[in-house]
C-alpha cells in the first residue's frame, strides 16, 4: 500500500509538471540589440513544452542568460523572475527581467609574434584588427583573432605554428579584460619538387602546368591552382595534389605528390534538341580527351536538322611550354545548308594558334581554307578561299548556368587575296558583345550587340556563310531566322555586307526559378549604308532556370513594318553568353 501511494504521488507530480509546461510562456525583458540576439540564441535550445515556473527551470534560464551576456562582456547582470497570471484566454508568463550591469572593457591586448610572423605583412596587418582599449569585451573578437592567426599559418605555410600562451584574463573588480597571446609561427615552408603518379601524359607536360617554382614560398592558393590546372586539361578523371609533410619537417621544403587517374579514352554523347531557328536537331559527339602521351585530343561531331547538316572535327595539340593556355587547333568539316534562298555545300579546313591569357582574354591567329559550292538567290558559284585571320575574345560570368553577372566579347578580322590563290579579295571585320547585369537579385538585364563589315569588289563570290543575315532568336526577334538582308530582282535574299543589330532585354524573377521577360531588338543587314533599312521587333517571354541551363519561350512581332505583321515564337535552350 505505501508503494502504491508513492507511485500515485510521483504520477501527480509528473501530471502537475506537464500541466505547468503546457500553460507557461517564457518572456525576457530589459535587453535589446546584440545583447538580446545573443541571449535569444542561448535560450533557443529550450522548447516551449519545457517551460515551467519551478526553481530548476529558472536556474537553467538564469545560466543561459548569463552565458549569453558574458560572451559580450557583461559579467554581472541582475536577473529577477516573476510569474504573472495569465491574460484572458492566455497562458501564465514566466517573466525574466534582466539588467546587464556594468560591462567589462578591454584593458590591454598583448600579442607577441615570434618566428616568421614578426616580419610577415599579413600577420602585422592582423595586429591592426585588435579592439581598441576601452571597448566592451567581446569573446568572439578574441576567438576570431586566434582563428585568424591559425588561418594565416595554413594559408601561407607556417605549418609548425603554435600558441606558447593564449589567455583572456578578466579582472571583475576593475571591470577590465586583458589579452595575453604569445604566438610562434615558426619558419615558413617552401614548395619542393612535384611528382606525379598514375599519369598517361609525359611528365614534362605536367611539370609545365605547375604555377610555381621549386623554392617559392608556400601559398595554399597556388596548390589549389595546380589542382585546377590539371583538371582543366581534360586528361584526367580525378586529380589530387597533396603535400608530403613527413619529408619536410627538417628542411621546411615541402614536396608535393599528385595522384591522377586517366580519363576514359573514348566518350560518346548524343542529344536531341529543338530551337525555332532550325527546328528539331539531332547531335552526336565522339570525344577522345587524350590520344597519346603528348596530350593531343580529338572531338568529332555530327549534327542534323532540316536546314543544316554538319560533320566536323577538332584536333587539339597542346604546346610543351604551356600546355593549358597555348595550343594548336586543327579543325575541318563538311556542311550542307538549305535555308530560305540559300543552298550551299561547304568543305573547310583551318589551322589556329591559341593563347589563353591570365587576364581572361583569348587570342588566336588562324589560316583557313574552304571550298564552297552555293546558290544564293539567282546566283550560283563555286569559290575556293585561303585566308588568314586574327581573333580576340573573353567570356566572364558569375552565378552558374544562368549568370547574374557576365559579359562575352569577340572581335575578329579575316583577309583574303587572290595573290595567294583565293578566288576573291575581301576583308571581314566582326564584333559581338553580350552583357548581363542583375540588380537586387530579381531584376536582370541582358544586352546584345553585333557589328559586321565586308569589304570586297566581287560580293557574288563571297560564300553565304561569310555574308550577313539578320533575324531570329539571337538577332532580331519578330522575324524568321536569317530572313533579313537585301534582295535581288526576283525578291530572293542576297545576304549583306554590313550588319548592325542590338537587343535590350529586361527579366524579372517572378518566383523561384521562373523569370518573365520583355525585350526589344533592332538592327539591319544592308549592302549600302546610304539605304538604311532598320527592322525592330519586340515581345515578351518566359525563362526557366533548368539544371542544364536556361530554357526560354519568347513571343515577338515586328514593329512598324508594313510588310511583316505576323507573330513569331522562339523556343531555345542554352547559355546566354
UniProtKB/Swiss-Prot annotation:
Transmembrane segments: 265-276, 279-288, 297-306, 309-317, 327-336, 347-356, 361-370, 387-395, 406-415, 428-437, 444-453, 500-508, 514-523, 536-545, 549-557, 568-577
Biological process annotations from GO: protein secretion
Domain of life: Bacteria
Keywords, comma-separated and alphabetical: Cell outer membrane, Membrane, Signal, Transmembrane, Transmembrane beta strand, Virulence
Disruption phenotype: 8-fold reduction in ability to colonize mice in competitive assays with wild-type. The mutant does not express the major autotransporter p1121 on the cell surface.
Residues annotated as domain POTRA: 187-263
Localisation: Cell outer membrane
UniProt keyword Oxidoreductase, yes or no: no
Record GO cellular component, one term: TAM protein secretion complex
Pfam families (UniProt xref): Omp85, POTRA, POTRA_TamA_1
Residues making up the signal peptide according to the UniProt record: 1-21
Known function: Component of the translocation and assembly module (TAM), which facilitates the insertion and assembly of specific beta-barrel proteins into the outer membrane. Promotes the secretion across the outer membrane of autotransporters such as p1121.
Family statement drawn from the similarity comment of this UniProt entry: Belongs to the TamA family.
Subunit structure comment from the entry: Interacts with TamB to form the translocation and assembly module (TAM).
Name of the protein this chain belongs to: Translocation and assembly module subunit TamA
Organism lineage string: Bacteria, Pseudomonadati, Pseudomonadota, Gammaproteobacteria, Enterobacterales
Gene name tied to this protein: tamA
Amino acid at each position: 500500500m505505501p508503494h502504491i501511494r508513492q507511485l500515485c504521488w510521483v504520477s501527480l507530480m509528473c501530471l502537475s509538471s506537464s500541466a505547468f509546461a503546457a500553460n507557461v510562456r517564457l518572456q525576457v525583458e530589459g535587453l535589446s540589440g546584440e545583447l538580446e540576439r545573443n541571449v535569444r540564441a542561448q535560450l533557443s535550445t529550450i522548447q516551449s513544452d519545457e517551460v515551467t515556473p519551478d526553481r530548476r527551470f529558472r536556474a537553467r534560464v538564469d545560466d543561459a542568460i548569463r552565458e549569453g551576456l558574458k560572451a559580450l562582456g557583461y559579467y554581472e547582470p541582475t536577473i529577477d523572475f516573476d510569474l504573472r497570471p495569465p491574460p484572458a484566454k492566455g497562458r501564465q508568463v514566466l517573466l525574466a527581467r534582466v539588467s546587464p550591469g556594468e560591462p567589462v572593457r578591454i584593458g590591454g591586448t598583448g600579442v607577441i609574434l615570434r618566428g616568421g610572423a614578426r616580419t610577415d605583412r599579413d600577420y602585422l596587418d592582423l595586429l591592426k584588427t585588435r579592439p581598441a582599449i576601452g571597448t566592451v569585451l567581446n569573446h568572439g573578437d578574441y576567438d576570431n583573432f586566434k582563428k585568424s592567426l591559425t588561418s594565416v599559418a595554413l594559408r601561407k605555410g607556417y605549418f609548425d605554428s603554435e600558441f606558447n600562451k593564449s589567455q583572456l584574463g578578466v579582472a571583475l573588480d576593475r571591470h577590465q579584460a586583458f589579452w595575453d597571446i604569445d604566438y610562434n609561427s615558426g619558419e615558413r615552408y617552401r614548395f619542393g619538387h612535384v611528382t606525379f603518379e598514375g599519369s598517361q601524359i609525359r611528365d614534362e607536360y605536367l611539370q609545365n602546368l605547375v604555377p610555381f617554382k621549386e623554392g617559392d614560398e608556400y601559398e595554399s592558393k597556388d596548390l589549389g591552382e595546380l589542382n585546377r590546372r590539371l583538371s582543366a586539361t581534360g586528361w584526367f578523371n580525378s586529380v589530387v595534389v597533396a603535400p608530403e609533410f613527413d619529408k619536410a619537417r627538417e628542411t621546411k621544403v615541402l614536396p608535393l605528390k599528385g595522384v591522377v587517374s586517366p580519363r576514359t579514352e573514348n566518350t560518346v554523347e548524343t542529344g536531341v534538341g529543338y530551337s525555332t531557328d532550325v527546328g528539331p536537331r539531332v547531335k552526336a559527339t565522339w570525344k577522345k580527351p587524350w590520344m597519346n602521351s603528348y596530350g593531343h585530343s580529338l572531338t568529332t561531331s555530327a549534327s542534323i536538322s532540316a536546314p543544316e547538316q554538319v560533320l566536323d572535327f577538332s584536333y587539339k595539340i597542346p604546346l610543351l611550354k604551356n600546355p593549358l593556355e597555348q595550343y594548336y587547333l586543327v579543325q575541318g568539316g563538311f556542311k550542307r545548308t538549305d535555308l530560305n534562298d540559300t543552298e550551299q555545300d561547304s568543305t573547310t579546313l583551318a589551322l589556329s594558334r591559341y593563347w589563353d591569357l591570365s587576364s581572361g582574354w583569348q587570342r588566336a591567329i588562324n589560316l583557313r581554307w574552304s571550298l564552297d559550292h552555293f546558290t544564293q538567290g539567282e546566283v550560283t558559284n563555286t569559290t575556293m578561299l585561303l585566308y588568314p585571320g586574327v581573333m580576340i575574345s573573353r567570356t566572364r560570368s558569375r552565378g552558374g548556368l544562368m549568370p547574374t553577372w557576365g559579359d562575352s566579347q569577340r572581335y575578329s578580322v579575316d583577309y583574303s587575296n587572290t595573290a595567294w590563290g583565293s578566288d576573291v579579295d575581301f576583308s571581314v571585320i566582326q564584333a559581338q558583345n553580350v552583357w548581363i547585369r542583375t540588380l537586387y537579385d530579381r531584376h536582370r538585364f541582358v544586352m546584345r550587340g553585333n557589328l559586321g563589315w565586308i569589304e570586297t569588289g566581287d560580293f557574288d563570290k563571297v560564300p553565304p556563310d561569310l555574308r550577313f543575315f539578320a533575324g531570329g532568336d539571337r538577332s532580331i526577334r519578330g522575324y524568321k531566322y536569317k530572313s533579313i538582308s537585301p534582295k535581288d530582282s526576283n525578291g530572293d535574299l542576297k545576304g549583306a555586307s554590313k550588319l548592325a543589330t542590338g537587343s535590350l532585354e529586361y527579366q524579372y524573377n517572378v518566383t523561384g526559378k521562373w523569370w518573365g521577360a520583355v525585350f526589344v531588338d533592332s538592327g539591319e543587314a544592308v549592302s549600302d549604308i546610304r539605304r538604311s533599312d532598320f527592322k525592330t521587333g519586340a515581345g515578351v517571354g518566359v525563362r526557366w532556370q533548368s539544371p542544364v541551363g536556361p530554357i526560354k519561350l519568347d513571343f515577338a512581332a515586328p514593329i512598324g513594318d508594313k510588310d511583316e505583321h505576323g507573330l513569331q515564337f522562339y523556343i531555345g535552350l542554352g547559355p546566354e553568353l
